[in-house]
Regions:
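Flexible, low-complexity linker and terminal segments
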Residues: 94-301, 306-307, 446, 470-566
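Thiamine diphosphate
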Residues: 68, 335-472, 482-483
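Active-site cofactor/cluster-binding pocket
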Residues: 35-38, 548, 555-773
């Protein structure tokens, strides 16, 4: 049986994992790069134990863009120092197989094992084939647990034993593993690579149909230097090193006297793409710069987020000089930066420790600055700083925004949630925990502007008296509220509206073509709470709808679809490969689009070759620019190569202006454009690209324009959520995608959302989309 659970932070998870191994069990501890460093003491300390135990496997997601973290630091140098083997999966299949292999290595060589998964794989999905289920018996509990102690003399002994036993064995393993892939092709030019960049290199090779020997490493610590030298000596021409991160492999080769072409000194490349690799190999890539700048889209908190009112209040206090410095943290609260309600951001749990240092250095600023942190991060590592403020008697104000869940990463539970991952009710009480640490605590409702203002005023007054106080602002994450509680409940009274645009702090409201604010399909109605925009409007221009006019997600009703009967078909009648990219704004349903296409590829028989899709994750999903890619058939990479896409889909019209996007389209293929406009609050309507700008950008391309949002609303969905399904229907009519029978498309849509009510709406949307071309 596999036991899965969330720990409060990565250091605790690593300790829990180590405890599992002492009980004889194999364990996988997952984290991103920041989590590695947060757990660094346990990671490094545990790396040198060399007695038999269960396998300790660290599954660590890198992010060399970065898109979801703040780190572009290459951790392989740390792994090398810790003498732990490192597996870098090249495909999704290898990523799935890696834990089993790691467990075998961990048990045999009595070592922790790192699976370093690249951001390119973690932010994509690919075809995998399931293996036979294997069961490993628990190892015997070590007779002498005293061996697992790190007294200085024992640490020395452990290090020496690792050098004598573990490392020679691991070096033999990496040099002789069949998982090193050497693809010979004439020896004129060679590429050494590892991880997901292997797929990118193959994409370039196949596109240009060039001779290229490839040595693809599966394990990068220890470095299989003998195999690398053998490969290097077999190449008559240049040898290239393509690796994400820093120059780890490149430096290892150069130390051995090999002359390779890799990254230049002070290179800014931390993550390769097929385009960058092609250019590195000497191929010319035609770039088509646009004269029109893309629309700036800073990520926003969700429409109706309980943090909205607090952000508005703090931004105003900052503007008026009542607050001079705001120290922020990691999580949804970081998005308050784009509301001018937060300034610094350093690391998980570090907001109040920054504030404390600032106040200790400038005691006169104790009542002029605040720190902000989320409840999940406070439980993760922020409470250490809370205790430090009490311990060191540092006056000031710490704000904990408590939405009960770890919202930014998907709504996982934390100790402050109602339940844990297993659904068990929790006894932890955040306010009592803070009080138990010796804090004075004030509580305010996140949907009550006046209460927030009053509470913050009181908190700053307490700070003026040289005391420390914690303000807890409480309101449930809007994503966790029941769907029936959501929907547009308000309207703009244009006679009262002065177009001050204070309400545009929420992504559920946008500037209309007439200049007046208007509610859009993202509006959640603050999930039945007192709406933030209503409270923020200084002119009372926002009013509740009459009962008869209320629009809710539950209002739509669709006829029952006919029963699906799949026709006979041959995969040989379909294109050898299909590739497309979808651009839009976070929240428009790109992820659903990709799921449908994946199901379609399975039904159409493309699983005999490969299916991959890539997606933007992280803060960009919160109203920022997002891109999804999909490929099936004879394909390798989740990142597309220029001139390879059979179609480009743009769910928000201006998003086609993003650099490099139009270059992805192959000659003669189609750009499918939604007429939807989402104007971010950081620009005016006049600054948004004109229709002439868009037309000029796509001049010379084959273009199909459709208003899928209007069509979705026309057929009965006032939320516009099925606009992406309308677009899928339109896509199904365009070549080469029209070679796949309509019934297969419909079955794919149904497979993703089979609930009768949802399927009925999606069926209507799909068929409506087909009628638009």
């Amino acid at each position: 049986m596999i036991n899965v659970g969330w720990s409060v932070n990565e250091a605790v998870a690593a300790g829990v994992g180590f405890g599992h191994t002492l009980a004889g069990a194999d364990v996988v501890v997952t984290m991103k790069i920041p989590g590695l460093y947060q757990s660094g003491d346990i990671f490094t300390s545990a790396s040198y134990f060399h007695d038999k135990r269960g396998a300790l496997i660290y599954y660590i997601a890198s992010d060399f863009t970065p898109s979801s973290t703040q780190h572009v630091i290459d951790p392989r140098y740390l792994f090398k120092t810790c003498m732990v083997p490192v597996i870098e999966p090249r495909t999704h299949q290898e990523m799935m197989d890696a834990p089993g292999l790691a467990a075998e290595i961990g048990r045999k060589y009595k070592t922790p094992v790192v699976i370093l998964a690249s951001g390119g794989l973690c932010h994509s999905e690919g075809l995998v084939r399931l293996n036979e289920i294997k069961k490993r018996e628990l190892m015997d509990i070590p007779e002498d647990l005293a061996r697992f102690n790190l007294l200085p003399s024992m640490a020395r002994e452990n290090y020496d034993a690792v050098m004598d036993e573990r490392m020679p064995g691991l070096e033999d393993l990496v040099e002789n593993t069949p998982l090193i892939k050497w693809e010979q092709d004439g020896g004129k030019r060679g590429v050494i690579t590892c991880g997901v960049t292997t797929a990118y290199v193959k994409e370039v090779r196949d596109f240009y149909n060039v001779d290229m020997d490839i040595l693809s490493l599966h394990m990068t610590n220890p470095v299989p230097i003998k195999k690398i030298i053998e490969f290097y000596d077999s190449i008559d021409g240049d040898v290239y090193v393509i690796e994400d991160g820093y120059m780890y492999l490149q430096e290892a080769m150069e130390r051995e006297g090999m002359k390779v072409i890799g990254k230049e000194k002070y290179s800014k490349i931390t993550e390769w793409s097929p385009t960058l690799i092609a250019e590195k190999l000497g191929f010319d890539i035609e770039h088509k710069p646009s004269s029109v700048k893309p629309v700036p889209r800073p990520p926003m908190i969700c429409a109706g987020c309980p943090y909205t009112l607090f952000g508005g209040v703090i931004a105003k206090m900052k503007k008026r000089g009542k607050i001079e410095a705001i120290f922020g943290d990691i999580g949804c609260n970081a998005l308050l930066y784009f509301m001018n309600a937060l300034e610094t951001g350093l690391a998980m749990g570090a907001s109040d420790s920054q504030r404390q240092g600032f106040v200790i250095a400038r005691p006169d600023k104790a009542a002029k600055c605040i720190s902000i942190i989320g409840d999940g991060t406070e439980c993760h590592s922020g409470m250490d700083a809370t205790r430090n403020a009490v311990f060191r008697k540092v006056p000031g104000v710490k704000v904990v925004l408590d939405n009960y869940w770890t919202a930014m990463t998907g709504g996982q539970p934390s100790p402050s949630s109602p339940v844990n991952l297993a659904g068990d009710e929790l006894d932890f009480d955040l306010v009592k925990a803070l009080e138990g640490n010796g804090c004075r605590v004030l509580v305010a409702s996140s949907y009550d502007k006046k209460e927030i203002q009053k509470t913050m005023k009181e908190a700053l007054s307490i700070a003026e008296n040289n005391e420390f106080v914690v303000v807890v602002v409480r309101g449930c994450c809007v994503k966790k509220q029941p769907p029936k509680s959501k929907g547009i409940r308000l309207k703009i009274n244009k006679e009262k509206c002065e177009k001050c645009y204070t309400c545009l702090m929420c992504s559920g409201i946008e500037k209309g073509e007439d200049g007046f604010p208007q509610y859009n399909n993202l509006c959640s109605g603050c999930a039945g709470e007192n709406p933030a925009c209503l409270q923020m409007c200084p002119f009372d221009a926002i009013e509740f709808l009459d009962e008869s006019d209320k629009k809710t997600a539950a209002a739509a009703s669709f006829a029952e679809p006919p029963e699906l009967v799949l026709p006979g078909f041959s995969n040989a009648d379909f294109p050898e490969r299909l590739t497309l990219a979808i651009r839009g704004v976070g929240g428009q349903g790109n992820l659903f689009f990709g799921k449908v296409l994946t199901q379609l590829a399975f039904i159409a028989g493309y699983s005999k070759d490969n299916i991959v899709k890539g997606e933007t994750h992280g803060m960009a999903q919160m109203g920022g620019p997002v891109i999804s890619t999909f490929s099936c058939g004879k394909v390798h990479s989740p990142v597309l190569f220029p001139q390879s896409a059979d179609c480009l889909i743009t769910m928000e019209v201006s998003e086609l202006l993003r650099p490099g996007y139009l270059e992805l389209l192959r000659e003669g293929a189609t750009i499918l454009i939604s007429k939807t406009k989402v104007i971010p609050p950081v620009i005016t309507t006049e600054e948004y690209p004109s229709q002439e700008d868009i037309a000029k950008a796509v001049e010379g391309f084959k273009v199909v324009e459709v208003d899928v949002l209007a069509k979705a609303m026309e057929i009965g969905d006032s939320t516009g959520k099925i606009a992406n399904v309308v677009m899928i229907g339109t896509l199904s009519k365009l070549p080469p995608f029209d070679t796949i029978p309509t019934e297969l498309w419909l079955q794919a849509v149904k497979n993703v959302s089979p609930k009768p009510a949802i399927w009925a709406g999606n069926y209507a949307a799909f068929m409506a989309g087909r009628e638009m071309v």
